[in-house]
């Protein structure tokens, strides 16, 4: 595994485009009790591994009343940028809010499905600070949690929070098909 950019292969081979940037790798992270985006982060996390697993290099449990923050500075080559710059998340457990340059972009609820958004309007000359704020209520709410449990035993296993599937960018023209 490429430690600086794990799982860097294109995640959807049947839809491969020529404009692809893998964002897996080291991001900054913070775990806080407040929802405000922190000025100071706790360290680095290896995306796309949840903070609870050793591959993330964090090994911390995110509790239901915690906010997990990710931050990554983007500096996209000018020849990469087309009509739209699509940011893809393979999956984030469980509620994710995405910000670019301190502007709210979108909220996604559901820890098992991919989601995407056009971030070009939020970038400044291809540059931007990407922040993802995550809440994972695990088994403390009505949201699907699978077999995750805060007190794992028997068939239950420890929670997995945050980004746990690949993250990538694609730049496309306006006539792109969603099929």
Predicted feature descriptions by range:
Residues 1-20:
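N-terminal pre-domain segments of enzymes
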Residues 57:
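N-terminal [4Fe-4S]-dependent radical SAM core
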Residues 23-47:
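Predominantly extracellular/luminal regions of secreted and cell-surface proteins
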Residues 18-22, 67-68:
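Short coil-to-beta-strand transition motifs
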Residues 2-4, 46-51, 140-143:
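Short amphipathic alpha-helical segments, especially helix-boundary/capping motifs
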Residues 8-14, 28-34, 60-177:
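Accessory beta-strand-rich segments of carbohydrate-active enzymes
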Residues 42-51, 157, 163:
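Glycan-recognition and processing domains
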């Amino acid at each position: 595994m490429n430690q600086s950019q794990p799982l860097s292969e294109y995640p959807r081979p049947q839809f491969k485009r020529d404009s692809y940037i893998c964002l897996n790798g080291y991001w900054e992270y913070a775990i806080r009790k407040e929802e405000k985006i922190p000025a100071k982060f706790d360290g680095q996390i290896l995306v796309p591994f949840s903070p609870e697993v050793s591959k993330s290099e964090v090994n911390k449990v995110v509790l239901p009343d915690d906010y997990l923050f990710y931050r990554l500075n983007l500096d996209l080559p000018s020849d990469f940028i087309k009509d739209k710059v699509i940011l893809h998340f393979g999956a984030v457990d469980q509620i994710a809010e995405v910000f670019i340059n301190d502007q709210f972009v979108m909220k996604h609820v559901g820890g098992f499905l991919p989601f995407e958004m056009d971030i070009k309007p939020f970038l400044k000359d291809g540059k931007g600070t990407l922040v993802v704020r995550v809440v994972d209520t695990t088994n403390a709410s009505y949201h699907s949690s699978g077999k995750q449990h805060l007190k794992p035993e028997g068939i239950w296993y420890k929670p997995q929070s945050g980004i746990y599937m690949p993250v990538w960018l694609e730049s496309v023209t306006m006539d792109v098909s969603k099929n």
